[in-house]
Amino acid sequence: MQGVIRSFVSGGNVVKGSVLQHLRVINPAIQPSVFCSRSESTQPARMEESGFESTTISDVMKSKGKSADGSWLWCTTDDTVYDAVKSMTQHNVGALVVVKPGEQQALAGIITERDYLRKIIVQGRSSKSTKVGDIMTEENKLITVTPETKVLRAMQLMTDNRIRHIPVIKDKGMIGMVSIGDVVRAVVHEHREELQRLNAYIQGGY
């Protein structure tokens, strides 16, 4: 994955209860109270736009289908890390949205597989006795994007901050989440189409 990312980024320039026993879907109207000032809207863009740099996060979410349109897996701050990781494994995802117990519209943060590795495995802690709220990334520290954010900009944010999942915010509410895999696939797709257009031009197709 890092190899793919490096092929697009060089020197700052773009070449172009026990809950989780079952699937739970979060309310798309979830309202975070505060979002970090490091979000997409406040960081200076450092990436050059190219002809194919037109795909937005909204396009990425649409391509993922209904599962990404306001719905995602979640857990609560009181759930054990063990149950959270079990859910990630069962559903083949790398992160869960975290909400406050009994308040499905109150975003508390997110927990990722990286949180588990760094804060449980490396530190020798018990995943069965540690609560999600103890190791999650709190909502006021989240890096975020909007549906209008360009995919290359989102990829820059994710690589700069060394994160693999990023919440999508609209009107102060969280409407979804995309991963670095989603973003890279979108960039590769756009890059491939651009190369095809250039090839057609060279061969007289235009």
From Swiss-Prot:
GO molecular function, one term: cobalt ion binding
Cited InterPro entries: CBS_dom, CBS_dom_sf, CBSX3_CBS_dom, Diverse_CBS-Domain
Major localisation: mitochondrion
Interval spanned by the transit peptide: 1-39
Signal sequence annotation: none
Listed PANTHER family: CBS DOMAIN-CONTAINING PROTEIN, CBS DOMAIN-CONTAINING PROTEIN CBSX3, MITOCHONDRIAL
Protein name (database record): CBS domain-containing protein CBSX3, mitochondrial
